[in-house]
Curated annotation (Swiss-Prot):
<dbReference type="GO" id="GO:0005739">
    <property type="term" value="C:mitochondrion"/>
</dbReference>
<comment type="subunit">
    <text>Component of the ATP synthase complex composed at least of ATP5F1A/subunit alpha, ATP5F1B/subunit beta, ATP5MC1/subunit c (homooctomer), MT-ATP6/subunit a, MT-ATP8/subunit 8, ATP5ME/subunit e, ATP5MF/subunit f, ATP5MG/subunit g, ATP5MK/subunit k, ATP5MJ/subunit j, ATP5F1C/subunit gamma, ATP5F1D/subunit delta, ATP5F1E/subunit epsilon, ATP5PF/subunit F6, ATP5PB/subunit b, ATP5PD/subunit d, ATP5PO/subunit OSCP.</text>
</comment>
<dbReference type="GO" id="GO:0005198">
    <property type="term" value="F:structural molecule activity"/>
</dbReference>
<keyword id="KW-0813">Transport</keyword>
<dbReference type="GO" id="GO:0045259">
    <property type="term" value="C:proton-transporting ATP synthase complex"/>
</dbReference>
<dbReference type="GO" id="GO:0015986">
    <property type="term" value="P:proton motive force-driven ATP synthesis"/>
</dbReference>
<keyword id="KW-0066">ATP synthesis</keyword>
<feature type="transit peptide" description="Mitochondrion">
    <location>
        <begin position="1"/>
        <end position="22"/>
    </location>
</feature>
<dbReference type="GO" id="GO:0042776">
    <property type="term" value="P:proton motive force-driven mitochondrial ATP synthesis"/>
</dbReference>
<dbReference type="GO" id="GO:0046688">
    <property type="term" value="P:response to copper ion"/>
</dbReference>
<keyword id="KW-0375">Hydrogen ion transport</keyword>
<dbReference type="InterPro" id="IPR048937">
    <property type="entry name" value="ATPD_C_metazoa"/>
</dbReference>
<feature type="modified residue" description="N6-succinyllysine; alternate">
    <location>
        <position position="165"/>
    </location>
</feature>
<keyword id="KW-0472">Membrane</keyword>
<keyword id="KW-0007">Acetylation</keyword>
<comment type="similarity">
    <text>Belongs to the ATPase epsilon chain family.</text>
</comment>
<comment type="function">
    <text>Subunit delta, of the mitochondrial membrane ATP synthase complex (F(1)F(0) ATP synthase or Complex V) that produces ATP from ADP in the presence of a proton gradient across the membrane which is generated by electron transport complexes of the respiratory chain. ATP synthase complex consist of a soluble F(1) head domain - the catalytic core - and a membrane F(1) domain - the membrane proton channel. These two domains are linked by a central stalk rotating inside the F(1) region and a stationary peripheral stalk.</text>
</comment>
C-alpha cells in the first residue's frame, strides 16, 4: 500500500481515481450482461488461424511471462517470445500452436489480436529435429567470440528450447 504522503501529490490522486473508475466500469457490464464473449484473431504473414472467433481463453508466452486471457481482460499490449499458444474454444476443445515471436493486443471490448512472425500447429513440428538444432546451436555458441553472432545463436537456442518444451 502507498504511504499517505504519496497520495497527496498533485496529479497522483487523479491517476488513482481514474484507475478505480475504469475498474468499476469494466466490472459493470459483466455483472449486467452475464458472461462476455471474447473475439479472437490470430494470424501469421502466411496464414489466418482465427478471424474474430469467439473463444473462452487464450494462453500466450510473452517476454514478461506467460499469461491467460479471458473475456474482459485488462487491456494490454505484449511482445511474444518463442513458445506455445493454447486456444481454448467455447466447446472445451483446445488448439495448440508454436509461435516464434510477434505481438498480442488485448482491447477493452474483449477483442484480442495475436500477430505472429511465424506460427505452426504442433503436428507440423519434429521433436528430433528440434533437439538436433538445439544441440548444434549450443555447440556453435561455445566456439563463438563475436557478440553479434553469439546473440543470433542465443536466439536460435531460445527458440529451439521452446520447441522442445512444447513438443515433449
Amino acid at each position: 500500500m502507498l504511504p499517505a504522503a504519496l497520495l497527496r501529490r498533485p496529479g497522483l490522486g487523479r491517476l488513482v481515481r481514474h484507475a478505480r473508475a475504469y475498474a468499476e466500469a469494466a466490472a459493470a457490464p459483466a455483472a449486467a450482461s452475464g458472461p462476455n464473449q471474447m473475439s479472437f484473431t490470430f494470424a501469421s504473414p502466411t496464414q489466418v488461424f482465427f478471424n474474430g472467433a469467439n473463444v473462452r481463453q487464450v494462453d500466450v508466452p510473452t517476454l514478461t511471462g506467460a499469461f491467460g486471457i479471458l473475456a474482459a481482460h485488462v487491456p494490454t499490449l505484449q511482445v511474444l517470445r518463442p513458445g506455445l499458444v493454447v486456444v481454448h474454444a467455447e466447446d472445451g476443445t483446445t488448439s495448440k500452436y508454436f509461435v516464434s515471436s510477434g505481438s498480442i493486443a488485448v482491447n477493452a471490448d474483449s477483442s484480442v489480436q495475436l500477430l505472429a512472425e511465424e506460427a505452426v500447429t504442433l503436428d507440423m513440428l519434429d521433436l528430433g529435429a528440434a533437439k538436433a538444432n538445439l544441440e548444434k546451436a549450443q555447440a556453435e555458441l561455445v566456439g563463438t567470440a563475436d557478440e553479434a553472432t553469439r546473440a543470433e545463436i542465443q536466439i536460435r537456442i531460445e527458440a529451439n528450447e521452446a520447441l522442445v518444451k512444447a513438443l515433449e
